[in-house]
Amino acid sequence: MKNFILLAVSSILLVDLLPTHFEHNVDLSRAINVNGVSFNNVDTSSLGAAQVRQSASRGRGLGEKPKEGADKEKKKEKEKEKEEEPKKPNENKLKQPEQPAAGAGGEQPAAGAGGEQPAAGAGGEQPAAGARGEQPAAGAGGEQPAAGAGGEQPAAGAGGEQPAAGAGGEQPAAGAGGEQPAAGARGEQPAAGAGGEQPAAGAGGEQPAAGARGEQPAAGAGGEQPAPAPRREQPAPGAVAGDGARGGNAGAGKGQGQNNQGANVPNEKVVNDYLHKIRSSVTTEWTPCSVTCGNGVRIRRKGHAGNKKAEDLTMDDLEVEACVMDKCAGIFNVVSNSLGLVILLVLALFN
């Protein structure tokens, strides 16, 4: 029995030794957690289903069939409830007002303030402007009435209707958010107020520039259309942010490279101690690493110091390079498992 226990323990150590030997940097605690059995991840969903089935079948005796009448009554009640529920017809909540059609050959009348433009009938025409009058587009929600004799019809303001100006009258400027009236015959068109819309210029008139947030309509007959002011291109904020991010990343990468370079530079004290130990054996070839596991250094002579005496070697005569060996934990696991296996085999064979 004692020999059997020793063989079992030695076999466990042997199995633990194999992956550690082939994969040098295996963590022993992680391997134990993988090989161990975890009782915390038990799936309890099936247990709940079994408990529900057991509680459902607990009410009837052995060999007793479930009552079918109760189930049928419940189904009938559900069907009746479904039939009694009235079906609501799908109604369109957005009801649009009806548009009256004009008579045959009739003209299209103008709607009131904020009204909608009715559809013209067969052969109906849109009311034309007066003599030499031009008909511009109506504003948002506004209707365009006909212009007077010799007057030009401007664009209507937001939600309002645009009246026609008198012959030869001067056009005043509209207030903030107000409506812009039409200019008289050969009258000059003033600039629209803040938020106002720019009306069309009169016959022979010049088209002024639109005010703040104003829209530029088409010029009237013989009117000159000024070129809009050149827009200044705004650089995309994403591009600026991207440039800043690239600059920050470049700076961070530069600093990281400097840190890595500084970390890889061997310590001068470590180099001097290692040189003091192997001074007589330093040649133009790289020496072994100063450590068996972890981070160390190795040195060699430069070309001009090949024939120099070992006692006269200085740091200027040597090339130093950092070296990295296997982790000490992996080597310790290999050694400890090997020693434990050997001891157990000796005890099992000689007892």
From Swiss-Prot:
Membrane topology listed for this record: Lipid-anchor; GPI-anchor
Composition bias, Low complexity: 97-219
Subcellular location: Cell membrane; Cytoplasm
Biased composition (Gly residues): 244-256
Top-level division of the source organism's lineage: Eukaryota
Entry-linked SMART domains: TSP1
Ranges for region Required for the binding to heparan sulfate proteoglycans (HSPGs) on the surface of host hepatocytes: 80-88
Mod. after translation: During host cell invasion, proteolytically cleaved at the cell membrane in the region I by a papain-like cysteine protease of parasite origin. Cleavage is triggered by the sporozoite contact with highly sulfated heparan sulfate proteoglycans (HSPGs) present on the host hepatocyte cell surface. Cleavage exposes the TSP type-1 (TSR) domain and is required for productive invasion of host hepatocytes but not for adhesion to the host cell membrane. Cleavage is dispensable for sporozoite development in the oocyst, motility and for traversal of host and vector cells. O-glycosylated; maybe by POFUT2.
Span list, region 14 X 9 AA tandem repeats of A-A-G-A-[GR]-G-E-Q-P: 101-226
Basic and acidic residues biased stretches: 61-96
Domain named TSP type-1: residues: 277-329
Any Pfam family hit: TSP_1
Keywords: Cell membrane, Cytoplasm, Disulfide bond, Glycoprotein, GPI-anchor, Lipoprotein, Malaria, Membrane, Repeat, Signal, Sporozoite
Primary localization class, coarse: membrane
Propeptide residue span(s): 329-351
Protein's UniProt keywords contain Signal: yes
Glycosylation sites: T292
Cystine connections: C289-C323, C293-C328
Chain residue ranges for the region called Region I: 93-97
Keyword Protein biosynthesis listed: no
Functional note: Essential sporozoite protein. In the mosquito vector, required for sporozoite development in the oocyst, migration through the vector hemolymph and entry into the vector salivary glands. In the vertebrate host, required for sporozoite migration through the host dermis and infection of host hepatocytes. Binds to highly sulfated heparan sulfate proteoglycans (HSPGs) on the surface of host hepatocytes.
Entry domain remark: The N-terminus is involved in the initial binding to heparan sulfate proteoglycans (HSPGs) on the surface of host hepatocytes. The N-terminus masks the TSP type-1 (TSR) domain which maintains the sporozoites in a migratory state, enabling them to complete their journey to the salivary gland in the mosquito vector and then to the host liver. The unmasking of the TSP type-1 (TSR) domain when the sporozoite interacts with the host hepatocyte also protects sporozoites from host antibodies.
Protein name: Circumsporozoite protein
Native organism: Plasmodium knowlesi (strain nuri)
Gene that this sequence comes from: CSP
